[in-house]
């Protein structure tokens, strides 16, 4: 499986760690340093998936996810939060339409599993009611 992933994190080391792990699995990776930069590049790079940190300058991950969901061009784009999230942030993320959560620190294999699951879910036909089920990719088995 391949695809283009937009990795958004203000920590350069974390961006590189995620990039290397995804590239080793055959994914193309584009990075952004915060939510504002993500919104600037998302239409130009047309990713298949976006990963977001929560705590970032200018525009945090939860507000970025909400903006991606409110834009018709990115409303169906899978979004995963990769962060040390509180329960409140998880609930807020689910309300904003985040598809999966991965807690920092994470195992590389878990990162790959979440990304693959979200991409498979995106390619799958919609459910009978035509909806996606947010949050399931981070917790279901595939």
Predicted regions and their residues:
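Active-site beta3 strand of CheY-like receiver
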Residues: 45-51
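Receiver (REC) domain active-site loop signature in two-component systems and cognate sites
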Residues: 56, 79
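Short hydrophobic/Thr-rich beta-strand motif most characteristic of the beta2 strand and flanking loop
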Residues: 26-33, 41
